[in-house]
Swiss-Prot record:
GO molecular function annotation: metal ion binding; peptide deformylase activity
PANTHER family, alphabetized: PEPTIDE DEFORMYLASE (PTHR10458:SF22)
Binding site for Fe cation: C96, H138, H142
Function, in words: Removes the formyl group from the N-terminal Met of newly synthesized proteins. Requires at least a dipeptide for an efficient rate of reaction. N-terminal L-methionine is a prerequisite for activity but the enzyme has broad specificity at other positions.
Source organism of the structure: Cytophaga hutchinsonii (strain ATCC 33406 / DSM 1761 / CIP 103989 / NBRC 15051 / NCIMB 9469 / D465)
One biological process term in Gene Ontology: co-translational protein modification
HAMAP family: Pep_deformylase
UniProt signal peptide: none
Cofactor(s) recorded in Swiss-Prot or TrEMBL: Fe(2+)
The protein's name in its UniProt record: Peptide deformylase
Active-site residues from the entry: E139
Length: 184
């Protein structure tokens, strides 16, 4: 099932998401639906709050990057906790399915260690670096109620204010179905 993607301005995007209790929902189906939604929108990651679910879960697929230095990773992260981030912060022009048409440089540490459960409720602790770490950090921010634009300087935020307001009203171009917080 392809979910509509929640647009900038929806309160669910600014909430700290809730842990998922084992057995409380079908995480295998939810993961499959989130991957289908992400792929339909040509994304590399999608967090549950972006499909209006206030839950600590996200999916990533870095195989879409055409770069031999990036090891493809396709995973579901349930109740993740970033235990440590380290390394030099580096900029990359990020975008977000909830904020179509807006991109900006965000600085993030190069490495991380994360603890999470998979869809079989097996616990993992793994380290990631480079672009995969960045995608995880971006999606993790979503379950913490943080958007990539929150990392920008106040000047850049002011410059984007009109565009962000328009997105919240549905005045944007997206090739996928979206849910807008403010009706036109």
């Amino acid at each position: 099932m392809i979910y509509p993607i929640v647009a900038y301005g929806d309160p669910v995007l600014k909430k700290v998401a809730q842990d998922i209790e084992k057995g409380s929902l079908d995480v295998v189906k939810m993961s499959a639906d989130m991957f289908e939604t992400m792929e339909n929108a040509h994304g590399v990651g999608l967090a549950a709050p972006q499909v209006a679910l206030n839950l600590r879960m996200f999916v990533i697929d870095t195989s879409v990057f055409d770069d031999e230095k990036i090891t493809p990773v396709r995973k579901t992260f349930i109740n993740p906790v970033i235990e440590e981030e380290w390394g030099d912060e580096w900029p990359y022009e990020e975008g977000c399915l909830s904020i179509p048409g807006v991109r900006a440089d965000v600085y993030r540490p190069a490495n991380l260690r994360i603890r999470y459960f998979d869809t079989d409720w097996k616990e993992h602790v793994e380290e990631f670096d480079g672009m995969t770490a960045r995608v995880i950090q971006h999606e993790y921010d979503h379950i913490e109620g943080v958007l990539f634009v929150d990392h920008l300087s106040s000047i850049k935020k002011r410059l984007l204010k009109g565009k962000l307001t328009n997105i919240s009203k549905g005045d944007c171009d997206a090739s996928y179905r979206m849910k807008f917080p403010i009706k036109k």
